[in-house]
């Protein structure tokens, strides 16, 4: 504990070369300063975080992990007055940028991999960030789409709420505009101006959308029906025969079309330059009736032409049939949701841009302009409305570029400021943070902490030689048992999951133990976005009877275990090469299962609207870090790591190894006292490498590692 305390409370010492040269965000900083002056704020801003702290902060916020030793060394070689700009540019292009911000949008959109279309929607968002798809286009597609997830991944947003008009009305208003209208589903909003009729008018945009399931493939998709399911007045206010379909309307304030605002003019000019590239891409194909008529006409024209002509007729007819847009007929577009998507994402809808600006500002700076971040109402005004509106208007003028928004914020003084000193007065701390003159303490997000441990421990690749670490583990297997003909077979083939004595003794059992609660299923975003063409199957099914479809479905089902056979489970020894490597937490099925590392450190379940990540500490978190496999594997020293070479051979340099270890794990160099303490830890180990593993374990478990500078 003494060594752990030294790590947690050790003083920070930096070479003079690691100076503070903040990047200039221009007008944003000036507008924020002017707004603070108008509010009568006279407090002195905290100094910018030092260069090493900035490199750690910006890498976590842009790439979703701590920087590697090589990255830090490269950063320090850049000229002091350029390194922050260069670092931001570097990590904006890092492949981790899309991974990290996909998790941000997964929280916002409540993406759940275990729900229909969830994994495809996550892949869609990841691709949108990678390509810098305009944010309004990304959202417009999600609101208006119909189809199945394999072909139209953005449909996951509608499927996430089971195509329920009431749930989608609440989600659309709160997720995309920060308007909590759900309360008005049952009664007029008690704290805001929205009425029950307003709620139903928004729900009516989704009233014709229905969820269906293919009888054979069990594929779930959405399409449109003729009549709306949303009726007015509500069921509890009128007789059934007095209700009629509700007329859709958009009750939210809107900038008047006659207003010619400068930021909208800039947007129009920017989009005009892009129109030529997009021209012709939106033309729809011929309808089913048109193509069938054309195919029939060609057949009639050539019937008298003999065998060769008949073959040509057949070939051309098949070619024409293949062009039929079966999906357009099956997955009908929603005119109502097309209209709603344009209204929600319009540049003249201030709620839309303001909300995303508020979300991203809160995520990066630590405090939102509006809190809670998705609760915009007259009685909950923004703390700095001019600064928020400046960012929102510039975001729109830059064609809703999400990358532009992130870069603008991380380049600002507000983002780059350090924390208030630990011994400062609490009221002063709160005032500085509310005025964005200091940044609040932020713990790493769960995924960032996971990937940072993997990065610090060199676990994205193997770090031991093949066969170097044989290990015997207990694996649970299921064994069939032939039933006794004199007794009924009551086994159903289920795995026995009662804790075994071996589990209780702490041995590693592959089936289920807390020791392995850090891993999960890895998602392949590219494969998820590769549409599978099932048009031929759909076309053939149209000619089949219901009985034929059911017979085909039963034939395609996997064979079930013999219900008359009993199964027992047993533990067997298995020798493995204990040389693991870990994949990124951002590529896991999400949310992770309950009890997983990510869930313990704040990843939400994404079930309810407005569900935030929590950053509270808990005993389970501490136990996961102290005893979990991820921390254990990261602490182990492998011969393929740089620090191994520093500690072995004819001339080991333990002082250099300690400095490098601090450099990699905490993104700083240790003080002389810390070096002395660290060498004592190394000397106390069974051998030097075990002692270094102890030191790395201590550093990974200290508060300094978990909290951002």
Task: State where each predicted segment sits.
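Positively charged n-region of N-terminal signal peptides that target proteins for export
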Residues: 1-4
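Post-BTB helical module
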Residues: 60-61
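Active-site beta-strand/loop architecture of penicillin-binding DD-peptidases
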Residues: 596, 600-620
